[in-house]
């Protein structure tokens, strides 16, 4: 049975450590660290993932690579007196995922664009790298597109800040349904945050 190019790319990215040569991966990470934190790119690194999430090679669709620090929340030190163990600085887990933080930072940098979706492309000891698909709702080619035209409506403005992307829905627990998900809908707040 003949397999498509997308299938081959997807198989490669299932185990990137085994599939991508180590020297090439090290050079790529070094280059990405030198790039700006939010860096516009010509085409996606993972074509299969980008296409699966709605990417099209057309005007009005913008690709951005960004990096976010790995690990738990970084909190500034408190000058008021207290036991070091009670400062609440270490081992604090964010309520948002790192992927969601990346999407929001990119959206703040591009206020005229809407975040469609994002996917992981790599990580090193300090950073995680994501590629984010942005859409220009005012572009005629997007307004006339059958698959992407929905994003031009006013009700989708600022969708990333309201947890409407895939990463946002996962953080709100909306990827779960059935038994155990009773306190997630209509929202966590409506259930007094007893759902997470």
PLM regions: where:
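An N-terminal amphipathic alpha-helical segment
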Residues: 58-75
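Low-complexity, rRNA-contacting terminal tracts
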Residues: 1-59, 81-196
């Amino acid at each position: 049975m003949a397999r498509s190019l997308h299938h081959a790319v997807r198989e490669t990215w299932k185990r990137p450590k085994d599939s991508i040569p180590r020297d090439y991966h090290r050079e790529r990470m070094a280059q990405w660290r030198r790039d700006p934190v939010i860096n516009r790119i010509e085409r996606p690194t993972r074509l299969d993932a980008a296409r699966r999430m709605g990417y099209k090679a057309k005007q009005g669709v913008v690709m951005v690579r960004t990096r976010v620090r790995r690990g738990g929340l970084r909190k500034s030190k408190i000058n008021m007196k207290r036991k070091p163990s009670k400062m609440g600085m270490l081992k604090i887990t964010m309520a948002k995922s790192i992927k969601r933080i990346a999407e929001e930072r990119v959206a703040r940098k591009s206020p005229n664009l809407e975040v469609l979706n994002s996917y992981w492309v790599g990580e090193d000891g300090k950073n995680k790298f994501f590629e984010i698909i942005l859409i220009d709702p005012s572009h005629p080619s997007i307004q006339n597109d059958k698959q992407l035209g929905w994003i031009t409506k006013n009700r989708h403005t600022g969708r990333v800040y309201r947890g409407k992307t895939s990463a946002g829905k996962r953080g709100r627990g909306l990827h779960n349904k059935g038994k155990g998900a009773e306190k997630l809908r209509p929202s966590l707040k409506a259930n007094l945050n007893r759902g997470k």
